């Protein structure tokens, strides 16, 4: 459920060494006077570990060895796990005191009413200050003591937040203020919009319920949060970790390397049988089998086993789907999807399903269908190939366990696309981050500037801190903490602190806030803090430094990993540029089916050869990436691009079905046995392409919890991004004019403006501002843009 107080989107000890040439090194950095040298500095900070250590330790050594240790993200309270728990208790007390103050003042004076929405926003910030960092820690921190403290903290604060969501007194005062024109005439448009948004969330949290019912609502909401945490933690768990095949199937495998690898694991298998062979589902072997094993029955068994979630995971999923349906019914909605989409761009599940169905129909039945062309190419590699096969025959013939095998055969056959050149050598992490700084400098006049981190400020020694700096206003926009080498966390974007203007006139003190957040140059705003975490393989620079090697290889990326960084940096820049006075609607705190637009659009930049061809350089020779190598690799990886889009549309459809009316109807018929597996298999049978009617993969789909009923946003925002790209950046992806238009129309507003109005301005099409069915059809490509 959404909340008036929270819009979540989302090792190594620090070793300080004294560099031998500290002063000269710092002087060399201080002498930077042109963008080229600053971009090179960015590259080396990420690619050269010794350079980074010299930069970090040399600049700060005096402060480090003489000054106090700071806490995570420069919050001085977060120096230990117990510090996090203590901080949560302090914030809880502060929040309770603020609630008493704002109610008392609003009931006794007009000034109290005028300040009420700003106070509510401040209350939200106090709680988010704890909940957001706790959410980050429990997912990304390498130390179990920290993660346990974060889980404890998150549950405590989330429970209090849910109590506030159903506080009748807070809601009544807010409603009276918004209905009083003598008060609203003295409020800014942003304050009114935030007030309306908070009022909506009160009402969507069951504020009109009877007290007992409201208590049940809060308890259910809390239980859903706990179940969601369990669900996310169990995403990688399998029903079984060994796959059984017959001895006969094993003997029929014609790949000697695979047979040898399978045989090697038999002594480690927890089971043994004279007539069976067991394949481990951990490691790379099962994926090698899916790619290279010609025995379809073996691939089938391995694929199903690899996609089977644990039984406990499916039970957890069924339970939170049931509870979500129960809550939506309590609130008077037809389904959880109706509840979720009411105030989104799409407005209702019917519009979402129409969008997805039209997309799928165009992909399957449209002229020159890229999807069918891809399937035909795979079918030509299949043992089931027959001349003159119909489209239906082809779709039916290719099973999900055939996909990787046939793709591997197709790519092996097309040896003209043989990738002799290692494109990754042109795509080091530092090269890409430097390139992003160049791109942002060109289109936004914004740079990424590395900044030293103090002892205790980061959770691991490899974390880089970046200051996002606006050259036009000569001001700091915010800070990024980048951990590209996390061992466990999939690529993720975390909001740690939102931008907000301090309420100095209401008694909020700079000296109190300074130890908790990072302030701007005027000390009037708290700056946004974002963490990006990826699980890239670490280069050998760290090893090389200790082995006495003069040269080292940085982390080298694939094109897909480059897309990932661009995608996540799209979210980050939205947070940096979307700085509002109130934090509730700052940055990425906008409509969920709009929030992916900046990140998806950034993928258009990463895929454009005019961008990578200008920023990608060989890590050792500094040679620019040749266009022919880039073109060859781009073509190679896009072989099943349309198939991937169709698969994503199936996932979005599943998300709608599992949060749709059918589960509510089951509850109305007093049926408690929610069966998500049957619903999944039924939908797969209907949608046909790569149809899975055997596994329980849906239990491994994390977005069913985190993006419940709004997973379609990725495809919807991709459709929007394509239009923005064609309208603004297609002629020149480095255009300052296009960047300014996009920044002014889309990014700077955060969530303080109707997304449809933002699109209407960005695309110069006022028909879109209505946000009606016609606007949806324009975005979906069903009608021509006006």
Swiss-Prot record:
Named cofactor requirement(s): Zn(2+)
EC numbers: 3.4.24.59
Active site per UniProt: 568
Keyword line: Hydrolase, Metal-binding, Metalloprotease, Mitochondrion, Protease, Transit peptide, Zinc
GO annotation, cellular component aspect: mitochondrial matrix
Residues noted as binding Zn(2+) in the record, renumbered to the chain: 567, 571, 574
Main location: mitochondrion
InterPro entries: M3A_MIP, MetalloPept_cat_dom_sf, Neurolysin/TOP_dom2, Pept_M3A_M3B, Pept_M3A_M3B_dom
Reaction equation(s) it catalyzes: Release of an N-terminal octapeptide as second stage of processing of some proteins imported into the mitochondrion
Residues annotated as transit peptide in the record: 1-29
Location relative to the cell: Mitochondrion matrix
Record note on cofactor: Binds 1 zinc ion.
GO MF annotations in UniProt: metal ion binding; metalloendopeptidase activity
GO annotation, biological process: intracellular iron ion homeostasis; peptide metabolic process; protein processing involved in protein targeting to mitochondrion; protein stabilization
Class in the EC hierarchy, top level: hydrolase
Function: Cleaves proteins, imported into the mitochondrion, to their mature size. While most mitochondrial precursor proteins are processed to the mature form in one step by mitochondrial processing peptidase (MPP), the sequential cleavage by MIP of an octapeptide after initial processing by MPP is a required step for a subgroup of nuclear-encoded precursor proteins destined for the matrix or the inner membrane.
Family affiliation: Belongs to the peptidase M3 family.
Protein name, as recorded: Mitochondrial intermediate peptidase
Species of the source: Meyerozyma guilliermondii (strain ATCC 6260 / CBS 566 / DSM 6381 / JCM 1539 / NBRC 10279 / NRRL Y-324)
Higher taxonomy: Eukaryota, Fungi, Dikarya, Ascomycota, Saccharomycotina
Gene name of the encoded protein: OCT1
């Amino acid at each position: 459920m959404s909340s008036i107080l929270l819009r979540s989107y989302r090792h190594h000890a620090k070793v300080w060494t004294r560099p031998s040439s500290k002063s000269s090194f710092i002087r060399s950095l201080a002498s930077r006077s042109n963008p080229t040298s600053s971009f090179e500095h960015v590259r080396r900070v990420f690619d050269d570990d010794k350079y980074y250590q010299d930069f970090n330790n040399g600049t700060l050594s005096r402060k480090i060895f003489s000054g106090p240790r700071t806490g995570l993200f420069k919050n001085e309270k977060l120096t230990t796990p117990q510090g996090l728990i203590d901080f949560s208790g302090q914030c809880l007390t502060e929040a309770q005191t603020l609630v008493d103050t704002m109610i008392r003042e609003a009931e006794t004076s007009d000034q109290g009413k005028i300040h009420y929405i700003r106070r509510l926003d401040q209350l939200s910030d106090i709680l988010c200050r704890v909940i957001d960092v706790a959410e980050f820690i429990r997912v990304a921190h390498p130390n179990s003591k920290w993660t346990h403290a974060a889980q404890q903290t998150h549950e405590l604060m989330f429970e209090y937040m849910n109590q506030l969501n159903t506080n009748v007194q807070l809601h009544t005062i807010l409603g009276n203020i918004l209905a009083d024109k003598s008060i609203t005439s003295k409020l800014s448009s942003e304050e009114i919009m935030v007030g309306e948004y908070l009022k909506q969330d009160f009402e969507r949290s069951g504020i009109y319920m009877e007290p007992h019912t409201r208590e049940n609502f809060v308890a259910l909401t809390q239980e859903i949060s706990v179940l969601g945490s369990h669900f996310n933690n169990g995403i990688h768990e399998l029903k079984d970790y060994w796959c059984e095949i017959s001895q006969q199937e094993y003997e029929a495998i014609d790949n000697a390397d695979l047979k040898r690898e399978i045989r090697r694991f038999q002594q480690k298998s927890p089971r043994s049988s004279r007539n069976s062979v067991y394949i481990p589902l951990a490691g790379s072997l099962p994926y090698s089998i899916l790619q290279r094993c010609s025995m379809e029955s073996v691939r089938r068994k391995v694929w199903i086993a690899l996609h089977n979630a644990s039984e406990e995971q499916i039970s957890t999923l069924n339970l939170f789907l049931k509870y979500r349906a129960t809550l939506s019914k309590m609130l008077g909605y037809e389904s959880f999807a109706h509840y979720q989409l009411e105030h989104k761009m799409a407005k209702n599940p019917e519009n979402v399903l129409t969008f997805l169905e039209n997309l799928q129909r165009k992909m399957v039945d449209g002229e020159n269908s890229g999807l069918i062309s891809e399937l035909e190419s795979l079918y030509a590699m299949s043992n089931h190939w027959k001349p003159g096969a119909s489209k239906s025959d082809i779709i039916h013939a290719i099973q999900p366990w055939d996909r990787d095998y046939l793709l591997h055969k197709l790519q092996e056959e097309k040896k003209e696309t043989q990738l002799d050149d290692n494109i990754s050598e042109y795509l080091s992490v530092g090269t890409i981050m430097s390139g992003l700084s160049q791109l942002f400098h060109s289109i936004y006049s914004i740079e990424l500037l590395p900044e030293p981190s103090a002892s205790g400020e980061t959770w691991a020694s490899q974390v880089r801190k970046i200051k996002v700096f606006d050259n036009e206003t000569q001001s700091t926009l915010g800070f990024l903490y980048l951990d590209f080498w996390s061992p466990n966390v999939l690529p993720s974007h975390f909001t740690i602190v939102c931008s907000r203007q301090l309420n100095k006139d209401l008694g909020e003190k700079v000296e109190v806030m300074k130890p908790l957040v990072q302030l701007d140059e005027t000390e009037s705003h708290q700056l946004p803090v974002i963490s990006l975490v990826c699980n890239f393989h670490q280069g050998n620079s760290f090893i090389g430094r200790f082995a006495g090697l003069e040269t080292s290889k940085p982390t080298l990326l694939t094109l897909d990993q480059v897309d990932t960084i661009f995608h996540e940096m799209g979210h980050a820049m939205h947070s940096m540029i979307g700085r509002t006075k109130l934090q509730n609607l700052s940055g990425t705190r906008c409509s969920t089916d709009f929030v992916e637009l900046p990140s998806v659009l950034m993928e258009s930049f990463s895929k454009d050869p005019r961008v990578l061809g200008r920023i990608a350089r060989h890590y050792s020779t500094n040679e620019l990436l040749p266009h022919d190598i880039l073109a060859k690799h781009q073509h190679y990886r896009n072989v099943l691009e349309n198939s991937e889009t169709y698969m994503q549309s199936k996932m979005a459809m599943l998300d709608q079905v599992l949060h749709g009316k059918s589960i509510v109807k089951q509850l109305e018929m007093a049926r408690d046995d929610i069966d998500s597996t049957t619903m999944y298999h039924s939908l797969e049978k209907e949608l046909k392409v790569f149809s899975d009617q055997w596994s329980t993969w849906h239990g491994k789909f994390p977005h069913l919890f985190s993006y419940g009923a709004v997973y379609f946003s990725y495809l919807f925002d991709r459709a929007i991004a394509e239009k923005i790209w064609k309208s603004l950046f297609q002629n020149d992806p480095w255009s300052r004019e296009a960047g300014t238009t996009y920044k002014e129309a889309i990014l700077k507003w955060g969530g303080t403006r109707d997304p449809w109005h933002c699109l209407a301005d960005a695309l110069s099409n006022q028909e879109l501002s209505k946000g009606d069915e016609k606007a949806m059809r324009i975005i979906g490509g069903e009608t021509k843009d006006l």
